Amino acid sequence: MSGHNKWANIKHRKMAQDAKKSQLFTKLIRELIVAAREGGGDPETNSRLRTAIEKAKEANMPRENIEKAIKRGTGELEGVEYQEIIYEAYGPGGVALYIRALTDNKNRTAQELRHVLSRHGGSLADLGAVGWIFERKGIISVPRDQVANVEELVMMAIDAGAEDIDDQDDPVRITTSPDNLMSVKEELEKNGYKAEAGISYVPKNTVQVTGKDAEKILALLNALEDMDDVQDVYSNFEMDDAEMEAILSQMNQ
């Protein structure tokens, strides 16, 4: 069985490879601006900014663009003022959605969000309606081809403070508390692993979807991720691996 994690990995790779790379840059720049505004322009003391810089570099964003975005966040350069907003929603099949947006116009974003949700069989929920389903966690991803000895990686991650390791898929997924995220990542990198790290919202319970509901939820997630104002979408669906692959293949035709 697979769920949101597998879909997110596929989506991440696709955005980094295809014509949507410019949209990926737009989202990364917004994250850099807000991270610098909230915690200052020094990545050594601002872990959110450090993570944003790493993601921008992984996407091959030019250094000049990264530096300009940080300066816009700290106020050294003029720029658009972005606001971080969390939206909660329901998707087809009763799937819970936790949506993080960075916007310069919250009325526009809410209107566009309602339109996208309605078009794909979803709806906005009241604040708190689905938020309780998700836990804020640190997530570290290590490509499977880097892991010669899974047991060694597991022990190293646990000793460094990891809470859980899922080694069934690619990449290997390591869960930490938000506070331990960077220290675990740094320990892995010190031992030769190339790891991606970030904050995620992990569901405490999941909903199984099949058939038309499965098609609708993947189409909805795709449409939400395509919104410029939406940074991240978290959900709690589970789906058969083969069914997900078939639906995604059909969507990409």
Swiss-Prot record:
Record's GO cellular component terms: cytosol
Gene Ontology MF term list: DNA binding
Residues forming coiled coils: none
InterPro entries referenced in this protein's UniProt entry, alphabetically: Integrase-like_N, TACO1_YebC-like_2nd/3rd_dom, TACO1_YebC_N, Transcrip_reg_TACO1-like, Transcrip_reg_TACO1-like_dom3, YebC-like
Record localization: Cytoplasm
Pfam families given in the database record: TACO1_YebC_N, Transcrip_reg
UniProt keyword terms in alphabetical order: Cytoplasm, DNA-binding, Transcription, Transcription regulation
A Gene Ontology BP annotation from the UniProt entry: regulation of DNA-templated transcription
Superkingdom of this protein's organism: Bacteria
Protein family per UniProt: Belongs to the TACO1 family.
NCBIfam families recorded: PRK00110.1 (NF001030), PRK12378.1 (NF009044), YebC/PmpR family DNA-binding transcriptional regulator (TIGR01033)
Name listed for the protein in its UniProt record: Probable transcriptional regulatory protein Tlet_1011
Species of the source: Pseudothermotoga lettingae (strain ATCC BAA-301 / DSM 14385 / NBRC 107922 / TMO)
